[in-house]
Every structure is written in structure tokens, then in C-alpha cells.
């Protein structure tokens, strides 16, 4: 694999392995801010938590380029823990009920501790 292709692939793997269920995108935002900061003059966070970078140019005719992606992913929220220790969950986003049983999940506590 060429060096550039490998760098791009590694970045894709990095971002897709970060946890970012809707409303809990802080891990993705933090990683993106860290990677974006050295490439731009300023990083701005909007009111919804989205990030964008601005790189100023002395050339008024310089092209304007935008790369866009969403940071969140579908997940679940625990709504109940039964007396037998079973977790009752509600979906956050759209899950395919036929494939969800084959997925791996990471459980985050209210204080942010992860349990795989």
C-alpha cells in the first residue's frame, strides 16, 4: 500500500473505531480537533457541536473547499436494569433488527467509564 493510501486508511480506521453515539460525540470531536488544528488557522465549533477549520489565504481567488461528515453514530440507551441483571435498551438512531444481535457494543456508565 502506498504511504498516502496507508495514512488515509489509518485515519479512516481511527475515526470509525471512536465511540460517538448521538449526543455523545465528544471522543470524535476531540480527535478531529487534534488532527485538524495543525492544518488550519482556526478551528470553530458551532452551536450543535460541529467543527470546521478555516485556512486564510492571501489570494482572493483561492478555491473554497469543504469536506463534510457527521460525527455521530447509532447506538442504544439503557432504560432499565431488570432484577435479573438484564439491560433493557432503547435505540438512538436507526438499527437493523436483523443484524443488531451480531454487533459488539461498548457500555458507557453515566460518568463515562467504558465496559466492552
Predicted features along the sequence, with ranges:
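N-terminal hydrophobic/helix-forming segments and targeting peptides
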Residues: 1-115
